[in-house]
Amino acid sequence: MRAYTAGTRWVWLDLDDTLIDFRANSLESLRLTYADCHLDRYFSSYGRWIKSYLHHNHDLWERYNRAEITQDYLRMHRFLDPIREHVPDMSEEEFAPEARSMDTIYLDHLARQKCMIDGAMELVRHLRAHAYNIGILSNGFTDVQHRKIHTVGLDTLIDLIGLSDDIGI
């Protein structure tokens, strides 16, 4: 590795898709959620469900990042909207408890996944070995991000975690 700028004390890294392979972990968690929640009741295949889920989830995150919706709305509707798209006669009130349960199941699976970006752990260990303070930044949900950091073993290597939830953005 190249020498670092003299006087640099902190290195800040994004968590998802820089250190942790969010996409791989999320897809595995969604596959497990599909099976655990028996979503084949509503969809003819996992492929149809995941396509609908990813479309709605992307739109909801865009709206959340613009502060147009709340975290609670995002977490429920990313599961509710794909199902209502395929089962239009189902009311929000009828499915809301199941959608909330699905979100909990998904986030629990997500927090347990261990797939990291190639070379990420080596980078963090290298920085730690050279006495750099390491901070992690993320826009993920506080409880899940802390669990993910612990699951992959980063919690013993970092000094500070800055989460958008914690600072109100």
Residue ranges of model-derived segments:
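A metal-dependent, Asp-based hydrolase signature
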Residues: 36, 55-105
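Class I S-adenosyl-L-methionine
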Residues: 31-35, 80, 84, 125-128, ...
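Substrate-recognition "cap/lid" segment bordering the active-site pocket of phosphatases
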Residues: 108, 112-115, 121, 135, ...
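Active-site neighborhood of HAD-like aspartate-dependent phosphohydrolases
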Residues: 2-55
